[in-house]
C-alpha cells in the first residue's frame, strides 16, 4: 500500500499544484485519477515516484517507510513501473531492447553497459507476449503504431516486476480502438499479477468502464474518491465546469 499524507506541491512562482492530498493506494487496485487539463493529475503521479518532490506532506510505502530516505526511494522506484503519455521509448531500438530497459534497475551501472543475461531477455519476451507483441520483438519501435508503442511501454513497466504502475495519460494520443486495447491490456495484467495501478485520464466513459475506483481531482484538490457506480453527474460536472465542451452528457 502507498499512503499519501497531506501532500502538497507549490512551485517557486507561488502556484499551488497540489493541496493537502491524503489517499491510500492499495495493491491490486485499478484506480483512475479523473480531471481536466491542469487539475494536478501529472504532478500527483510524479510525486508518488519523487520525480517531482512534494513541498509538504509525506509519501509512505507500507513495509518500507518514508520516501525521503534515499535507500527506500531507490527500492520503491525499482518496483514501480511508469507509463508515459509520449511513450518515452528509444525510436531506433527494437521493441525487445526497449522492454529490457525495465530490467536495468536490477543491475549495477557497470553491468548495464553490457548485454543483459538471458534470464532478463526471457522476461522481456514474456512481457511482449502478454501485450500481444511478441512477433514485433525485433522491430524498431519507430515502425510501430502509436497503440503498439504504448503497449511496448506497458511491457517495459511490466519487466520491472512492479508492485505498482503509474500511467500518465497513457491513451491521450491514441484513437478509440487503440485506447480500449491499451487499457484492457493494462487492466488484465494488473488483475492477474495483483499490481496496483494509478492511471490519469480525462475520458469519463473510459474511467467508468475500466476503473475499480475513481479519484476526482480539480485545481489540485480531491473532489471525490469512490467506486464508479457511486459517482454522481454533479461531481463530474464540478471537475469539467471550466471546459468549453461537455464530456459527461452521454456517460451518466
Swiss-Prot record:
Catalytic reactions of this protein: phosphonate(out) + ATP + H2O = phosphonate(in) + ADP + phosphate + H(+)
Keyword Iron-sulfur on entry: no
Topology within the bilayer: Peripheral membrane protein
Occurrences of domain ABC transporter (ranges): 2-244
Domain of life, per lineage: Bacteria
Function recorded in the entry: Part of the ABC transporter complex PhnCDE involved in phosphonates import. Responsible for energy coupling to the transport system.
Protein's name in the database: Phosphonates import ATP-binding protein PhnC 1
Organism: Trichodesmium erythraeum (strain IMS101)
Lineage of the organism: Bacteria, Bacillati, Cyanobacteriota, Cyanophyceae, Oscillatoriophycideae
